[in-house]
Each structure stands twice: as C-alpha cells, then as structure tokens.
C-alpha cells in the first residue's frame, strides 16, 4: 500500500507542476485566450477519454495499466521538453499536453480499483483513501509551488523534464507492487464488444440505486466546484479587493483546509456511518460559499474556504470508500472512469454557468445561489443516505466466517463485505438434508452453529463443525452434488448463491487457486476433514 501512495504522490505533484508550466507557456505565447483554449482542450480530451481508458483497468492487471499511464505521460512530457528546447511551434506542445491529459485518465480509475484488492479490512480501505486524499490536498498546492519555483529559476523546459522524471519514479514504484491474482486472465474472459465494455460502468451505476445517489451528489459538488473556480476570482478582486495575489491566497485556504480535513477524515476509519459523513461533507462544502456573501471579511472568508477544503476531503474519502465497497470488482475501474468523466463535465458546466449567474444576480447573489445548491440537494437525500448506512452494516460474525474459509480468505476486504451482505441465513432441524448426492447444486454453505454429517454412497465419511463449509465442487465444476450432507442436530448455516460465489471466486486468482486446491483434496480423499459436496 505504501508504494501505491508514494506513486500517487509523485503523479499528483508532477501533474500539477506540469499543468502550471503549460499554462504559463500558453500565456506567454498567446495570452489569456491561449490559456483558455488549451485548458478547454485538455479538459475535453480527458472527459471523452476517461470511460474508454478505464476499460483497461478492468481488462488487464491494474498495476501495469498505471505503469503504462505513467510511462506514456513521461514520453509525452519529454516530447514537450524537446519541443520547447527546439523552439518548435506552440501547437506541438499544446497537442502533447492534450495527449498527457488523455494518458492520465487511465491512472486514477485503475488506482481506485486496485486499492480495495490491497486492503484487507474496511478500516484499511478507509485509511488508504484518507492517505490518498491527503496526498492530493498536498499536491494541489505543493505541485504548483514546485512548478512555479522551477519556472522562475529554470524555465518551462526544465519543469517538463522534472515532471517527466516524476512520472518515471511513479511507474517504478508501482512496478514493485507484488503481483496478486488481481491480474486479469484474458483466456477466461468472454469476448465482448468495446461498446459493451464501455457501457458496463454506466449500466452498473444506472442499475444500483445507491451508486446513482452517490454519483449524483458527487456531480452536484463538482458543479459547484466549477462555479467556485470562477467566483473565487471575483471574491478576491471585487468583494475583498486583495488583487491578483488574493486569488492564490483563497485557493491556498481551500488546500490547507483539505489537510485539516484529512485529520477529520481519519476519524472516519472504522465508522459505520460513511454515507452520513458523505452527506455532511456535501453540506459543509456549500454553506460557507453562501456565507461569504453575508460578511465579506478577509479573515472570515479565508476560514470559510478552509471549511470548504475540510468538506472536500470528507466527501472524497467517504464517497470513494462507499463506491469501492458498492461496485463489483470486475467493473470497478469502469465505474470510476464514468465518475471521472462525469466530474470533469460538471466542473466545466459549473464554470460556464457562473458568469451568467454573476451577470444576472451580481456577486453576492451568485454566491448565495451557488452555496445554497448543495444543502438543497443533500437534505432531501438524507433518508436515502441513512438507508445506505443501514444496509451497509454487515455482522462481524459473517465476515469472520468468510475470512476463516480457505476459499474466501485471499479475497479483498471490499469483496468480502459484498459477499457477507449476500449471505442468506438457513436453519435446519436434526436429520434434515441440506444437500443430496446426485442433485444439482446452486448454493455454497458456511456453518455457523451445529454439526452436520457427510455421506458418500450412503456411507458416513465425515462430520462438519462450525467454521467448516461445503458445496463448492458442484458450483465450480458444474456437476451434481458429490455427497449428501445431513444435520445431526439443529444447525444454522449461511448460504451463498451460485452467482455471487462464482463471481467472487473465479474473478480473483488466489481465491480460485485456493478453491481448486480444496477441490483436489476433497475429490482425492473424500475423507480426513474435508467434505465432498
């Protein structure tokens, strides 16, 4: 996990430093118009490419997708450096900047989908997202600062070279992550069209009510973020009269607030109310913006924008964790690719809408509307957020049973949570048959309480106790039950249906290998502590 966090730090610092260098170069070449055109082109290219690039994270080993993204960016940035030193036409550097943006869209979805496979518990997953959000907050103000210092001392070409080296360092760190069977096996995949692959992320979000809600609230937040990117300039120049330097101070306040938000988000580790935390983060993202219009005092505004930064970190940590725990692993990167694209589009839309609000309502009116939007959106959604928290609570005993199973033990913590939520409690009386030899199998069973006896061709071969499991042979080999399992006394079982069992076990290499090992032992012995069923 440490390697992926360090790689993310190198990537985010390099991205922001490079972005500053491109903006300054564009301004020197063509003024504000060039800056706007280049920025729009980079944003548009990334928004279009993101859902397509995210397919890679679900088809291939996510580590190597991230490495490929880093290497591609390093090559394009090195090309920009060569173009700069060769006095090539500015269009060459602009095109390369667009290619860097496109290449970057594969990195974040693959990273967001890889982290759950490295986290062993829900708490570790939340902690990893806290670290990622903290690193991003640092990168947002440290990256431009580094880029600015290098620009002042050495020029854009050197910034390009340094940021290209940062991408290479990120790639090296990721390449050192040990391979888990998270890597995809292309031979076992069913051939599908690119369109089907592309739409899988959209379909997953559309099908799951909780994911629609989360993505919708994320979109509302980034829409207001886009408006704030315009409004913050007006706040500095008109309301506070701090000049152009004030724009930087106000943006820094948000970044510093994000660091304090990381401390608040650290308290989320282990909490069972992350959807409520997400809603609180959305709420406090908006309210301070409206309050700026009420009392435009410089110190007060800095504090308010720091609160926005706190809300931003809480939203990022809780929202990312909820999505990682909600989406199936096989489409997780594409879900984040869709999210990335939607967020880019809503940020741009917010930036377009803000000038119209300013012309229509004036500065204070625009601030009140922008700040009120998020509370007005999240308050009606509060019952649904609470419902997400209620349904997300998984009894610890179910997770413990899954972790104790040799088949499920290798699975990522987020996948285990999803399986625990899919378990169905089954009770049986003494002498009642759970499965019968020769019948089709459609469930896998974990024993919570009681004792069961296993019969093969009418002969008692084994007894099962709490913590044992049975039923995987019929599911994985698609054969009839190989044994009869009967309750010796009253028993309590947890049943997992075929669809959930196969999706989890066959989609994760270590789990499939463990299952095949168990099957080999069962079919090879039929006795000695392992049941054939």
PLM segments and residue spans:
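Ligand-binding loop in jelly-roll beta-barrel domains
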Residues: 478-499, 510
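Amphipathic alpha-helical "output/dimerization" segments
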Residues: 500-520
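Membrane-interfacial segments at transmembrane helix termini in multi-pass membrane proteins
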Residues: 375-408, 516, 524, 531-533
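Regulatory nucleotide-sensing modules
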Residues: 398-477, 481-483, 503, 532-533
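Residue-level signature of catalytic and energy-coupling elements of molecular machines
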Residues: 163, 366, 467, 485, ...
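Alpha-helical transmembrane-bundle signature of multi-pass membrane transport and export proteins
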Residues: 1-389
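Short, well-structured alpha-helical segments
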Residues: 96, 304, 412-421, 516, ...
